[in-house]
Amino acid sequence: MASLVLSSLCFTSQKPCSFTSSLRFSLGALTGSRSAAPLTVGFRPVKRRNGRIRVSVYSRASPLVFRDLDADDFRHPLDKQNTLILKAIPGLNELGRALLGTVTEQIMLLENIGTSVLVSKDQLPELHKMMIEAAGILNIESPDLYVRQSPVPNAYTLAISGKKPFVVIHTSLVELLTRNELQAVLAHELGHLKCDHGVWLTLANLLTLGAYSVPGEEQENLEDDCPYGTRINLFRWLRAAELTCDRAALLVAQDPKVVISVLMKLAGGCPSMADQLNVDAFLEQARSYDKASSSPVGNAQTRQLSHPLPVLRAREIDEWSRSNEYRSLLKRATQMNVVEKV
C-alpha cells in the first residue's frame, strides 16, 4: 500500500515503490521511541532566570532575502526535470492535493498537538523567530513548528503546502546544533514544502504502482512487480530532492560551512565533541570517498538509497556554493531590515 511521503533530515534506504514506512530522513521515525531521558530544549548555553529557561542565542549579520524566489530557482536539475514531467499532466497537481492533503494533515495535526510542543512567540520564542526569518528569506509562509522529545536527532515535515503545513524537530537535534545550524535545518524542511515534494514524489510513486499492478490481483507486494530500473530512477529522484533542500538550507544560512557542519554532526557528532569537529576535514573525507566508491561495488551501495550519503551531500553543497547559479541568486537578493527580522 503506498503511503504519503514525509520528508526529513537524516539519511536512510527506503523502498520507493511501497513507501510503507514513509520517507523521513530516517534516523527518526514518527513512531520512534519516546521513552528516553528528558532533554533540555534550547541552544548552548542554557541559563535559568527566575525559574524559567532562557535560551542564549548567537546573532549574525542581517541576512539576504530572496523576495521573488521560486522553487525552480534552486531545484536540483533532476528534481526539476521530473517535477516538470508530472506538472505537464493536466489536473494532476489538484488531484494530488485533494487526495493527499486534508485528511492526512488533520491526522498529523492531532498527532503533533498531542505529543509535541507547539512553538510560538510565547512558547520557545527564539525558535519561533528563527522559523519566521528562514521562511521570509525563502519567500514562503511560515508553517507550524513543533518540538518533540526524542534521543534521535531529526526533523521532518509533511511535504505539502496545504492548509496546515508543519515542521517537527527533535530535542536531541536542538542540543546537537548551533543556532545557525538549526536554522539551516528548518530551511531544509521549508525547501521540501516550497517544492511540494510530498505531492510530486507521492504521485510518482502512485503512478508507478498503477502502471505495474494488475486489477483483481493481490496488491501487498507491489514493490516486487516494480521493475528494477524504475525503482532506481525513483531513488535518484529522492536523492535529488534532498540535494534541492540542502540548497534551500544554504540560501538561508548563506555560509556553506554551516550546512556542511549540520551534515557532519548528523553523520557522527555529539554535543560533547561538537567543538572538535572540522568541516574542512569532512570535505576532504568526501573526496576520499569519491575515489574509494568509483567502482561497481561503490555504485551498487548507493543506487538504492533514498538519501545521498552525508559526505556526498557535503561535497554537493560545497560545489553549488561556488556555482554561477548560486552567485546569481545572491545578486538578486536584498538585505533583511530590522523590522522584518522581528
Predicted segments — roles?
Residues A2-K163, P227, R231-L234, L238, ...:
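Hydrophobic or amphipathic, alpha-helical segments that drive membrane association/targeting
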Residues D122, E126, V168-V185, N233-R239:
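Short pre-active-site segment immediately N-terminal to the catalytic Zn-binding motif
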Residues M131, I169, H188, C245, ...:
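Residue-level signature of catalytic and energy-coupling elements of molecular machines
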Residues T244-A253, V262, Q301-R315, E319:
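Active-site-proximal alpha-helical
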